[in-house]
Amino acid sequence: MTASALAYLEPDSSAELTGVYHLVLDRPEARNAISRSLLQDVLQCLQVLVCKITQPKQDEPLPRVLILRANGPCFCAGADLKERREMSEAEVIEFLQDLRHMLEQVEKLPIPTLAAIDGPALGGGLELALACDFRIAAETVSKIGFPEVKLGIIPGAGGTQRAPRIIGMQRAKELIYTGTQLNATQAKDLGLIDHVAPGSTCLKLCQELAQQMMPSAPLALRAAKMAISMGANVELARGLDLEWACYEPLLESKDRREALDAFQQKRKPIFTGK
């Protein structure tokens, strides 16, 4: 992290959550709006995280779960409209292409991802949350939605595609066509949010969910995520083939052998991600 970074990556401080990392948006004075600089900082954090996963170092914990959160009272207000007003049409197109790429990188992370929503998640901010595996919001959050149609545009970084896949086409149409802003409970009822945490912060609940995943074998978690994600929008027969393609490599893993040995020896397995 540099002094000017608008997003940073850090390990969880709890010993029980070794392997849990936080990707933090840090532009609270601008409601964590996505500027070009913030976008590039997030991309850099994602590159570092992927490197930690694919090229682990012995003196660093292997990333197991990512919590995506933000500093300040707002999760993310979407694109930086002040910056957008100064952009040419070509620059807007380039920005949207970069934003779509960034969200695809979040979605493609091989480890489970949790969006910790403690404040408004609007437009591109909600699109960012939808790219995560789970969305957890504090019960005090009162603004979750897509206001784009009221600004003369549409969600342009995956919102029109991910929202229908998560909440269904009709609900997504109503949400996007009307630009309705939901509170946390309404968003959960709609299926946009998976869990609502009491109070004004959901970080503790995110950490509890992450802790529930910690006993799982890292390679198995990655394979499960890949199988579910790749098979979600294909025919069942193709999905079953994808499931097997994700399952088969685990047969040769050291973690699978460790699990069998631990079961026989009546102890907890010690997984290494190998």
From Swiss-Prot:
Sites where the protein binds substrate: 77-81, 124
Record-listed E.C. numbers: 4.2.1.17
Superkingdom, natural source: Eukaryota
Site (Important for catalytic activity): 148
Induction (free text): Expression regulated by iron through the urbs1 transcription factor.
UniProt pathway annotation: Siderophore biosynthesis
GO BP, sorted A to Z: fatty acid beta-oxidation
InterPro entries according to UniProt: ClpP/crotonase-like_dom_sf, Enoyl-CoA_hyd/isom_CS, Enoyl-CoA_hydra/iso, Enoyl-CoA_hydra_C
PANTHER family reported in the protein's UniProt record: ENOYL-COA HYDRATASE-RELATED, SD19268P
Protein family according to the UniProt entry: Belongs to the enoyl-CoA hydratase/isomerase family.
Name of the protein: Enoyl-CoA isomerase/hydratase fer4
Organism: Mycosarcoma maydis (Corn smut fungus)
Gene this chain is encoded by: fer4
